[in-house]
Amino acid sequence: IKLPFQSDVIEENATLFYGKGISEAPLKMAETFGEGDEVTLWGEVFKTDEKTSRDGNTFIFTAYFSDKTSSEILKVITPTENSEIIKSNIKPGKSIIVSGKFEFDTFAKCLNIRPWSIASIKTKKRQDKADEKRVELHLHTTMSDMDAVTPPADLVNQAFAWGHKAIAIT
């Protein structure tokens, strides 16, 4: 589907796999939401959980996703026959856009989004468009004694993607 809004972060085409469509531009997750609020949010999935009801007829899927301003929880409760389409499209590392309503989950004891529609999206990559590239003098990687989570190969690949001609690691 073609999304009905322009975004600096989200590409304009999306793949709808649950519901009828997305008609609103997404809000930032950092805004305050309450029970009953109807929202459209986007984010990158970083964790998922799944369960099947005791009778085997209902699939319960929980996804945790973030737009880098905050994080929210998405809970999909659907017939078991829909489980594969949900599991294959909502995975850690994938980005989604969701329209739904905030509801209090009495089982998890927190607010989560019950979706009407969910679509897979692609995010626009950050670019360094400067003619003269900047110099980063200090980085920590997993090779550092200091705490770091970025592998050196990821930093080298990002520098290459931004058009840097050289990189030095000491």
Residue ranges and their predicted role:
Residues 1-170:
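Phosphodiester-processing cores and adjacent nucleic acid-binding clamps
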